[in-house]
């Protein structure tokens, strides 16, 4: 189970789905993508991308190690692209408030690359505790930036890389 908290857009969830499919992990992975409002939830569930944007993304896809054609993962109709149903069905979209809602599941991975910069120090600490409480031991946490030494949960994680906000929960 992977929680994608407050993705920047539907493309972030679709990118994760494609990555997991290429690594042969998608069939046994559930992605929970949460957004802060019902309006965003509606938009994400119905979203499409212009085919031209998909074509422009092909070079970035190849540069990041993508295999084959990016368009192989999409239905194309009327100048729009939508992720294939077999990939969309493993993404559960839900409305969720990072500040006020409680943990709703235990995850092996949590990715939050966009929302934390919007929060002040107190709310950031609350959300980081929520992520710790929702992440299984040895689960992976991906954040927008590295932990600060003053972050309440910093001792619960081990960095996965020298630079960047990727961590493994160790306690």
Where are these predicted regions, by residue range?
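Short helix-capping segments at alpha-helix termini
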Residues: 22-27
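A short glycine-rich, Lys/Arg-flanked "PGG" loop and its adjoining helix->strand segment in the class I
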Residues: 125-137
């Amino acid at each position: 189970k992977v929680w994608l908290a407050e993705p920047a857009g539907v493309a972030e969830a679709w990118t994760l789905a494609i990555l997991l499919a290429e690594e042969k992990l998608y069939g046994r992975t559930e992605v929970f993508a949460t957004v802060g409002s019902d309006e965003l939830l509606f938009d994400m569930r119905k979203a499409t991308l212009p085919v031209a944007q998909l074509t422009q993304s092909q070079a970035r896809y190849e540069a990041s190690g993508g295999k084959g054609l990016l368009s192989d993962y999409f239905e194309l109709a009327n100048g729009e692209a939508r992720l294939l149903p077999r990939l969309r069905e493993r993404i559960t979209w839900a409305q969720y408030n990072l500040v006020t809602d409680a943990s709703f599941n235990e995850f092996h991975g949590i990715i939050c690359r966009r929302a934390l910069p919007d929060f002040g120090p107190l709310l950031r600490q609350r959300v980081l505790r929520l992520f710790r409480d929702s992440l299984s031991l040895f689960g992976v946490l991906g954040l927008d930036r590295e932990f600060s030494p003053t972050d309440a949960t910093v001792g619960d994680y081990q960095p996965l890389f020298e630079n960047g906000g990727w961590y493994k929960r160790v306690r």
